[in-house]
Design a protein with these regions (language model features):
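Conserved single-residue anchors adjacent to enzymatic active/cofactor-binding motifs
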Residues: 1-218
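Short, charged alpha-helical interaction segments and adjacent helix-coil junctions
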Residues: 70-76, 173, 180-281
Length: 281
């Protein structure tokens, strides 16, 4: 029987940094990146230096793999209009931080930016997006490839293998039907639950290690406070959005639009629009 587990973002902040729990994050990254990932160490990341608001809005963890790759995993709960730009900033910062002065550029580490978001980032119906940067010829339409020497020296097959790789998981777009092992992970990220039949790498360890009952008394208090902060933030956000919709609806009441049309434009129910109209008359 499956049971609710603690949220993945809180686990990233408090539990997944311990070596005994590396297997959970290794499993997730292995399923997403489609090759086995072994974590060598957890490095200092921006998410360790957050203000009070960010403690429950955003968390990240920076991983160094045994192949000397950097993997930045970030969870973002609330909407940010410039989130794409922040993804670029985060990766650019890593590029400059992890190359020593005077070192050749060829020593720059491969970087993976994995972004788990719980809001409507951009426009798209999918729930897992992968950025594939290629140099395409404007005239010949061919893809620029590395030379044989570059392939040998840098152990790459494509030029894009050198550049940072971006992934975005729009968790709320997932329909809860797990068709493969990556879907099983997305289901867990969305529902904090591992179903009994799930076989994805790392989820067996998540099911064992991320039980609320396994937390210390102090950690239980911290997690309960985290959950309460999230509920308050969600309530404030919902109220603000509802008020914004009402203001838009009020302005549309001055037009010839019907209640049904105003409801369609604002996301309010017809009953809510009718109530606004009767209040304004």
């Amino acid at each position: 029987m499956s049971r609710k587990l603690i949220r993945f973002d809180w686990a990233m902040k408090k539990l997944l940094r311990h070596k005994a729990n590396f297997g959970i994050l290794e499993g997730f990254l292995s399923e997403l990146l489609r090759f086995d990932v072994t974590i060598e160490s957890i490095l200092e990341s921006e998410g360790n230096k957050q203000d009070e608001y960010d403690k429950y809005n955003r968390v990240d963890i920076l991983v160094k793999s045994q192949n000397n790759e950097l993997m930045l995993v970030e969870v973002q709960n609330d909407s940010e209009i410039d989130y794409f730009q922040r993804m670029i900033f985060g990766v650019s910062k890593l590029v400059t931080e992890y190359i020593k002065e005077g070192e050749p550029y060829g020593t720059i580490k491969k970087i993976y930016s994995v972004n788990i978001v719980y809001f409507g980032l951009g426009q798209g119906k999918d729930y897992v997006y992968e950025y594939k940067g290629e140099f395409v010829g404007l005239h010949e339409k061919d893809i620029l490839l590395p030379t044989s020497l570059q392939k040998q020296d840098f152990k790459v097959e494509k030029v894009s293998d050198i550049f940072p790789k971006y992934y975005i998981l729009k968790v709320n777009n997932f329909n809860d039907v797990a068709k493969d092992t990556l879907d099983e992970w997305v289901y867990f990220l969305k529902n904090s639950e591992v179903k009994d039949g799930f076989k994805a790498k790392g989820l067996d360890k998540a099911k064992e290690k991320l039980r609320y009952e396994s937390l210390t008394a102090e950690d239980k208090k911290m997690y309960d406070r985290f959950q309460e902060n999230r509920r308050i933030e969600n309530s404030v956000s919902y109220t603000a959005k509802l008020e914004e919709k009402r203001e838009i609806a009020k302005s549309l009441l001055q037009t010839s639009l019907s209640n049904a049309e105003i409801a369609k434009h604002t996301g309010l129910t017809v009953e809510q629009v009718e109530q606004l109209r009767s209040t304004n008359e």
